[in-house]
Regions:
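Glycine-/small-residue-rich "gating" segment that lines the acyl/pantetheine channel
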Residues: 36-40, 144, 151-158, 179-186, ...
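Beta-sheet entry/capping signal
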Residues: 3-6, 64, 117-120, 166-167, ...
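ACP-dependent fatty acid/polyketide chain-elongation machinery
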Residues: 1-87, 92-96, 100-104, 215-217, ...
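Flexible, low-complexity linker/loop segments at domain and module junctions
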Residues: 1-8, 110-116, 138, 235
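Active-site-proximal alpha-helical scaffold in enzymes
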Residues: 6, 14, 93-111, 153, ...
Length: 236
């Protein structure tokens, strides 16, 4: 059909142990709730710096929705050395895994798209891990740059899969993933690419973002996001 775009595969990770379209659908149909207490080790790197930090961390230690095993990554599967993986923003690791799963969900062998004009369009808005990498001056090395940059989220995926189409990251805050999908659809309709990997990723690895949202009154009182609901009262 002229002027049509087909969604052929999906990959996902969400709080509540959701790691596939099937588990996401089951979660929705059962009315699941992923809100949980803050993991005890979430802000471990910031503990004990000062009394002021400790007080601030108490404000940031609110219930919310948290991904499990953010540090887990099979680097060698993607041809990445364990050392290089240490310097990768977890958002890069997550996109590699989920994009691979999306291709498999579509029945497309990842190796079959190598050398193609497939594009990568990723929305994000959190760069706190990269900031920490760049501020750790004694440990900066060759892998730090690409591991810290948001553009690496898309570019590393293009590199690993050998994709030659457009590859970029955009930040429009909460709408970033939707804008990424919109731009991917435009590129497909314009004939700029024949296949697009599009979506979003958002891992908040620093209490600073949580405190910023708290100060702005943008956090839900009970740690639950309630999109499209009359009781919606903030980010969860």
């Amino acid at each position: 059909m002229a002027g049509a775009v087909a969604l052929v595969g999906i990959g996902c990770r969400f709080p509540g142990g959701i790691d596939s379209p099937a588990s996401f659908w089951e979660f929705l149909t059962e009315g699941g709730v992923a809100t949980a207490p803050m993991p005890a080790d979430r802000w471990a790197a910031y503990q004990g710096i000062s009394e002021e930090f400790t007080a601030a961390l108490r404000l940031a230690g609110r219930p919310g929705n948290f991904l499990g095993d953010v540090d887990g990554f099979d680097a060698e599967f993607f041809g990445i050395s364990p050392r290089e993986a240490q310097f990768m923003d977890p958002q890069q690791r997550l996109v590699l895994e989920v994009a691979w799963e999306a291709l498999e969900h579509a029945g497309i062998a990842p190796a079959s798209v190598a050398g193609s004009d497939a594009g990568v369009y990723i929305g994000t808005c959190s760069d706190d891990y990269g900031r920490r990498l760049l501020e750790d001056l004694p440990r900066i090395e060759a892998w730090t740059g690409i591991g810290a940059q948001l553009t690496g989220i898309a570019n590393r995926l293009s590199h690993v899969l050998d994709l030659h189409g457009p590859s970029f990251v955009l930040d429009s805050a909460c709408s970033a993933s939707l804008v990424a999908v919109h731009l991917a659809c435009q590129a497909l309709l314009a004939g700029e690419t024949s296949l697009a990997l599009a979506g979003g990723v958002n891992i908040i690895g620093s209490p600073a973002y949580t405190l910023t949202l708290h100060a702005a009154g943008a956090l839900s009182a009970d740690g639950r996001s309630k999109p499209f609901d009359a009781e919606a009262d903030g980010y969860g």
